Every structure is written in structure tokens, then in C-alpha cells.
Amino acid sequence: VWSNGEPVTANDFVFAWQRLVDPEAGASYAYLAETIKNANEIMAGEMDPAELGVTAVSDTEIKIELTQPTPYFESLLAFSAFFPQNEAFVTEKGDKYGTSSENILANGPFTIENWDGTGLTWDLVKNEDYYAADEVQLEEVNVQVIKETSTVVNLFQQGSVDNAQVTGELVKQLATDPNVVVQKKARTAYIEFNHDNVYLQNAKLRAAIGLVINRDELVDSVIGDGSTAIGG
């Protein structure tokens, strides 16, 4: 159920995905949908978004047509780019959609409140219409964007904030602090090569550049947040 009381339907996903690949929307993650039928042609402006290979079979079921086997496709669906959007709400808000808490419609465990679009604070308020609202233990989360890591650490130590993410040199300084919790997650970072460069068109040269990167030194001395290098 949307936070305005309307039901979430399969059409909300179809609309959202068509909007994702619509070149007029300029979505930065549109490429993630490239294995869906006609997605590349739509992103190139050669076909209408309505021709995307996604259709609503019923109010609760969608049919997705892929152009090739995509083993990771199901994991993509958990990414925010594939979240549903309420067509009537998006159309009503127009260019203002997503620019403030009043212009955002939610269907998750929280709604966003008190955000003006540029401010560095907002509130996440429990969504009573969420299907599993009884399992949501927090009534409200107050979010602050604090750009200086040392500042947020000081606020945490003073008890003014409940959570602080630390990076770089502070990780080493706080390594023995009993309040520090290390959460290791699989994450991939990459370097993009400009294939317009005649030399970088050579796959062996690109592979060679990758081989000379000292990953251990990179994570220890540059990132410095406790990350562990992997091969590849």
C-alpha cells in the first residue's frame, strides 16, 4: 500500500521501469535494465518506452522478457532503480517529484518527513500502512548529514547521535573502542577506460593496468577503513 492509501500494483512497476529507460528521464542507472527486451533501443531513442519488455499480467503479477540469460537479474530487482512508482502521483508532481518530502510517495516501512529538498536533516517516520508495520520497532529516525567525520564521532561520543560511520584514519584511531562495530560487506569498485583512446582499446593493455594495481596497498593506505582486498 502506498502511503496515500492506494494499493501498489503491477502497473506501478511497469510504469517505473518504462520511466527508468526513458531517455527523457535521464536516469543514471538506466543501463541496469539493458537485458530487458527493447531497453537498449528505448535508451537510444529508437523505440517508445511503452515497448519495453515488461507487462502487467494482473494487479499482482508482471511478465519480464529478457534478451539473454541474466543470472544476476533477480538481485537487480532489490535495487532502488527498480522500485515501483505511482504513475498518478508522479504525473501530478511533474518536475517536483522527489524534490521534497511532500513530493515523495512511499510504500516501505518508513515515510520521509520534514525534508525541504536541500536541507541536511529529515525524519523517517513509521509507515502505519506498511504491510508488516507490526514488525517495525522504531517509531521515528532522525537523520542528520554531517560532512566532517570527526564532528559526527564527537557527537556520538557525547551521546548526541546514535550512529556514526567512520572512515580513513579515524578507523585506526578507534580500532580498540568497544563501541566500534565492523560490518564487512562485499563491494566492487572499478576503473572505467575510455575506449575512444586507441591504446585503451587493447584488452591486454587494460588487463595489464589492472594487474599492476596493488590492491592491498590501496585498501590499507588509501581507503584505510578496514577493507580487505580480494583478487580479480
Question: Which role does the model predict for each range below?
Answer:
Residues 13, 18, 59-60, 67-71, ...:
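Solvent-exposed coil/turn segments that connect beta secondary-structure elements
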Residues 7-14, 27-88:
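Surface-exposed binding/hinge segments that line
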Residues 26, 165-232:
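Local pocket/hinge segments that shape ligand/substrate recognition
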Residues 99, 104, 126-174, 204, ...:
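Ligand-site clamp/hinge motif
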Residues 2-3, 130-133, 197-205:
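Short helix-loop capping/hinge motifs at secondary-structure junctions, enriched
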Residues 11-19, 71, 75, 139, ...:
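Solvent-exposed, polar/charged alpha-helical surfaces in well-ordered, non-transmembrane soluble domains
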